[in-house]
């Protein structure tokens, strides 16, 4: 078991946005969003665990997670998007998936523990453009 800062991000009304701009426009929007987020992730020393219409990330230090969140909010606003971010520090277990499973599409690392759903719920409480930290 280890302690880390867990970060969940979510783009507000992403489904409506995709309906409005279409699949091709959405593909470009996601590419821009993902590039900005991953650049910030690298600069702040985090790890990408999963991606949907947002990210699930871990950081060794809460300060690094907070710096990521500030940059992420600025980047999404610059892209004309509204994001909510939740950060929670807690104990988790990191489990490596077998290489054969990763080759079939599994994530390389799974994060287990109560801190994970707690962090997701913190994010769900945030409004667009807001970051909450517990």
Q: Which role does the model predict for each range below?
A:
Residues 1-70, 75:
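Catalytic NTP-binding/metal-coordinating core of nucleotidyl cyclase/transferase enzymes
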Residues 35-38, 42, 54-134:
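Catalytic beta-strand-to-alpha-helix segment of the class III nucleotidyl cyclase homology domain
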